[in-house]
Amino acid sequence: MATFSDHETSEFLPMTRPRSTSSASQTSSDSGLSSEPAFQEDQKQPFSAPNGTTGMDNGDRYRDLEDGEAEANEPFLASSKKAATGGRARRIFWLLVLLCFGGWLLAFVLFLTGGRANYQSASDALQAQEPESASGSTSSGKPVTLEQVLTGQWSPRYHAITWVAGPNDEDGLLVEKGGGEQEGYLRVDDIQSRKNKDGKGGRVLMRKPIVHVDGKLVVPGNAWPSPDLKKVLLISDQEKNWRHSFTGKYWVLDVESQTAQPLDPSLPDGRVQLALWSPKSDAVIFVRENDVYLRKLSSDRVVTVTKDGGENLFYGVPDWVYEEEVISGRSVTWWSNDAKYVAFFRTNESAVSDFPVDYFLSRPSGKKPDPGLENYPEVRQIKYPKAGASNPVVDLQFYDVEKNEVFSVDVADDFDNDDRIIIEVVWASEGKVLVRSTNRESDILKVFLIDTKSRTGRVVRTEDVASLDGGWVEPSQSTRFIPADPSNGRPDDGYIDTVPYKGYDHLAYFSPLDSPKGVMLTSGDWEVVDAPAAVDLQRGLVYFVAAKEAPTERHIYRVQLDGSNMTAITDTSKPGYFGVSFSHGAGYALLTYNGPSVPWQAIINTHGDEITFEERIEENPQLTSMIEAYALPTEIYQNVTVDGFTLQVVERRPPHFNPAKKYPVLFYLYGGPGSQTVDRKFSIDFQSYVASSLGYIVVTVDGRGTGHIGRKARCIVRGNLGFYEARDQIATAKIWAAKSYVDESRMAIWGWSFGGFMTLKTLELDAGETFQYGMAVAPVTDWRFYDSIYSERYMHTPQHNPSGYANSTITDMAALTHPVRFLVMHGTADDNVHLQNTLVLTDKLDLSNVKNYDLHFFPDSDHSIFFHNAHAMVYDRLSSWLVNAFNGEWHRIAHPVPGESMWTRFKRSLPVLV
């Protein structure tokens, strides 16, 4: 599919696609949607009055009629005739008395209940709505409920398999959990044995999902087979640490005997942070309490590799900021291919300041407080380097397994210790290792080649990205080592890396290892994504994922190592968003179709020139059935042009969309550098719920700074986060406000994390001109409060760029008085975007006497907001708050009518006797 282009007479070219069993799509959010109960039921109707608004004309949009108000100044019972005398008069008199009493009682009830601004929850509003007539869309069925979204009922099923190399380097082996007719709990199959319906032909690694160790029942939560498939490393009692890291108790299962023993027999209950198999299957390197240990399976003895790990020194595992911003994982330990060496990080946090996180209800340490301290919160001190503050000092160390010796290799790189960020380590052959590192501001990349045998190293490649295009180096761990093979035309070792090339990210092949210039494998006005995916060394083929057909799509391609014969292996004639994982030799792959239609998975054979399907392993029939039963939004993908930049947009229209109506519009955004929210994945998420059940239009635009639209559009935001991104949101909102079917007086914007920052920044810049409402969850409000590695990558240091930090901070409180109202929510135990951001903003609002906002805090919740039903509550609050915004509740609060005294109102309620 060709990329949309601009048109002389239109600012965008739409491509309309209603939801059906053959097509659906997805956006992703920094916050995510997960299993939590919510309030809404399936039978609720879309929240939309018959005329497409709230049921009020323009004059009454923000003012409901108070109960009884129309009759308040009229006599309850009046007559122009005089009362008769005698018995008739007495009867009339008592009748009047009764009527007066009844009128007074009714007036009193109306006084107690009438005229108040009723805060209306989304569920209450939905119950009160009449279903709108079907028009504009052929979709039929029930609306999507928030409960369905939060509990994952709309989430596709994906088959979990792991490719492994066989003991004799066989290709096409995979590890998966058994089920159905397949024998065993954990098993290894090759592609051919999977075709046997009786399950025979594979190898069972674990017969049961539980194991017994010295009479103790162990229920493993995860398993890692050894390379020779004779043993399995198990983890139990797993506890989360940060986003990626966790600890647990580790066990080693012998496949033949189905017996297990502790990883460290001398300390069976010790909590381990990381454990990795040796490539020879004869040892496990592991980390406990920030020190590295080696267990050789030939004995029960554990070798201590490092001894001084602790609160300020981390060995083999990342600290908070490296886990979050550099590695995006829990391991900084790497075995050499020949199992002779282990490389690992030594992280010194002595100079990094602590940030306290209070826990008022829970105790993450698991420790019982001392007597008398039960009512004090637990305080967790986190080593958290903020922008401009001291960074952790990270060194790469090596362990010689045979000599039982730890050493380091000094390389002159012109980076000071606190000005170096190591972003990737890749073992080559014969004890050589490639190390990619950047300066603190992530705009100079240096590649080192270290020889562990001679214990020497040197810089072999330098890229000054700041001078190239003013951009930055995004950390990644996708560099691929290519061993020499003269018989296949590769006389020297080499590697494949992603490099900037003519304004886009592309693949280059560097050979030999110390080559400063690579052979370009890809080129063009499009970008590769997390590439390469795999390399077929026998055929000299490089497989990769790219956004070539459109920024919103992902297809799989392959190219020769000399850059020739690039071809797609997925169908590029229609929109698609594919993912892939390859077998050890790249002869097979698990192909995952993520959308826009219902996702499916298949194992494919890539040995020949033609790709063949071996087995379709997942088709998600339950989603196909649900799509037929529910009224889903129509999604329209299009482009807008802002300041000459083409931006991707998706508009979600409610079922039965009627262009003659006026609809409220919610903008949803994330907008962080290199991110993407507008894509062709299948998803029924919170935005889908808003369109389907509440009847609002939802628009998402990926503005400047986001990913896969070229480096020029991406790098322009550097040093001034929020400046261009907010303008793109406002410019797009103005385009929508001018549409005939949009109610320009009811437009809102919301986002989480960076999206929360963008919500506030957009409201600040817009000053109520376009957006009347906003909802910000866990927002950054000052980039000096965020971590150093992320902030400085996109903003430089505060010392280097003080004006940029000042401009990016939410400071214009006067501008924030112009929207009708905005909402800010935050978890009090957010270790990522600290509560400090919202508290400092609140203080600024107080000092400026700003009142048009609401706050909601979630005790003990971190950045994902999950603690004690918080995840359900945060989305319920978003939904309810939005309903009240578009129903005019917040406008009534902002423009209150002066109230009457109780006595005046009581007198008005009395009947007038004539």
Curated annotation (Swiss-Prot):
GO MF annotations, alphabetized: aminopeptidase activity; dipeptidyl-peptidase activity; serine-type peptidase activity
InterPro entries associated with the record: AB_hydrolase_fold, Peptidase_S9_cat, Peptidase_S9B_N, Serine_Prot_S9B/DPPIV
Compartments in which it is found: Vacuole membrane
Ranges of Basic and acidic residues composition bias in the record: 1-10
Gene3D superfamilies associated with the record: alpha/beta hydrolase (3.40.50.1820), Dipeptidylpeptidase IV, N-terminal domain (2.140.10.30)
Predominant subcellular localization, coarse grouping: membrane
Positions glycosylated per UniProt: 348, 565, 639, 807
Polar residues compositional bias, start-end: 45-56
Protein origin, superkingdom: Eukaryota
Keywords: Aminopeptidase, Glycoprotein, Hydrolase, Membrane, Protease, Serine protease, Signal-anchor, Transmembrane, Transmembrane helix, Vacuole
Active site: 753 (charge relay system), 830 (charge relay system), 863 (charge relay system)
Reaction(s) catalysed by this chain's protein: Release of an N-terminal dipeptide, Xaa-Yaa-|-Zaa-, from a polypeptide, preferentially when Yaa is Pro, provided Zaa is neither Pro nor hydroxyproline
Enzyme class: hydrolase
SS bond list: none
Free-text function comment from the UniProt entry: Type IV dipeptidyl-peptidase which removes N-terminal dipeptides sequentially from polypeptides having unsubstituted N-termini provided that the penultimate residue is proline.
Family: Belongs to the peptidase S9B family.
Designated name of the protein: Probable dipeptidyl-aminopeptidase B
